[in-house]
């Protein structure tokens, strides 16, 4: 007999197991947070003179907003990226990263929803999410670093732009691969929050 996790109509039956769609979304958000953390920490290209690094984690943040929706995506992208800074010893950046990456996922998800509702191309929405990443990462980190380090913060702008462009390209490549997975496609196409 299948296990009923919630007693409402908002559940999905799969191979004898019943799963609430909210629980499924939470599980996917946790997976995206873990992916964002690992993608940020696994491939690091140091940026000279800044003490920072370029990484592919931004692509996961963008895709979290698109696939999970703005709210769950914001939580997954922000928490996963901030965990990477925490584990990596970049303690001062943990709250900054939480906010900036959370906003990237939030805005990417909102753009995706708006474009999908108006019948526009979903792939264009992914690219616009990548552009959002470039603006928020380069601008957001510059503003925060300006308060921390003064005018020397400008040195990080080119590296943050390169990181954002990398996030755009990687998310554009990964989107069709992920959307081909039925559960991921269903989550992305039905996303409401």
What kind of region is each of these model predictions?
Residues 2-193:
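Loop-helix junctions at membrane interfaces
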């Amino acid at each position: 007999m299948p296990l009923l996790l919630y007693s409402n109509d908002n559940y999905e039956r799969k191979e004898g197991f019943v799963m609430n769609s909210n629980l499924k979304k939470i599980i996917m958000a946790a997976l995206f947070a873990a992916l964002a953390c690992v993608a940020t920490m696994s491939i690091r290209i140091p940026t000279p003179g800044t003490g920072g690094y370029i990484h592919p984690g931004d692509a996961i943040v963008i895709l979290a907003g698109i696939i999970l929706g703005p709210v769950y995506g914001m939580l997954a992208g922000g928490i996963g990226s901030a965990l990477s800074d925490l584990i990596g010893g970049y303690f001062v950046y943990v709250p900054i990263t939480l906010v900036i990456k959370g906003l990237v996922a939030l805005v990417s998800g909102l753009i995706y929803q708006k474009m999908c509702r108006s019948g526009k191309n979903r792939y264009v929405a992914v690219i616009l999410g990548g552009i959002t990443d470039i603006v928020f990462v380069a601008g957001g980190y510059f503003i925060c670093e300006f308060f921390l380090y003064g005018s020397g913060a400008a040195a990080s702008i080119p590296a943050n732009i390169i990181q954002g462009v990398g996030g755009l390209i990687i998310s554009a490549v990964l989107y069709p691969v992920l959307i081909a997975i039925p559960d991921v496609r269903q989550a992305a196409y039905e996303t409401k929050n």
